[in-house]
Amino acid sequence: MLDKTLRMNYLFDFYQSLLTEKQRKYMSLYYLDDFSLGEIAEEFDVSRQAVYDNIKRTEAMLEEYEEKLSLLAKFEKRSEILQQLKEAVDKQATSEELMALLESLDTLE
């Protein structure tokens, strides 16, 4: 499983358009720009607790979106199959093996 920061970055990439502008700003500053809660609080003139609560709520929302839409899971599976395809081509796999991998990629959606 991905570490939390990397997972949140992926989820943010996939689902940021579903967030409010404020949620996007807080998440971007916290996860992408590595701001501390205190720095974000100072930037927006709110308490650290308000920033913390907003980020935790947004993380939960991103996890809910992933649970329902599975964009990250599909991305990871697609990446895994593409890696298997590359390895199969390198080892000169049979056309049946290659077709099986292509079909699994095709049925992923």
Swiss-Prot record:
It comes from the Bacteria. InterPro entries: RNA_pol_sigma_r3/r4-like, UPF0122, UPF0122_fam_protein, WH-like_DNA-bd_sf. Pfam families: UPF0122. SUPFAM superfamilies: Sigma3 and sigma4 domains of RNA polymerase sigma factors (SSF88659). Might take part in the signal recognition particle (SRP) pathway. This is inferred from the conservation of its genetic proximity to ftsY/ffh. May be a regulatory protein. HAMAP family: UPF0122. PANTHER family: UPF0122 PROTEIN CBO2450/CLC_2298, UPF0122 PROTEIN YLXM. Belongs to the UPF0122 family. This is UPF0122 protein BH2485.
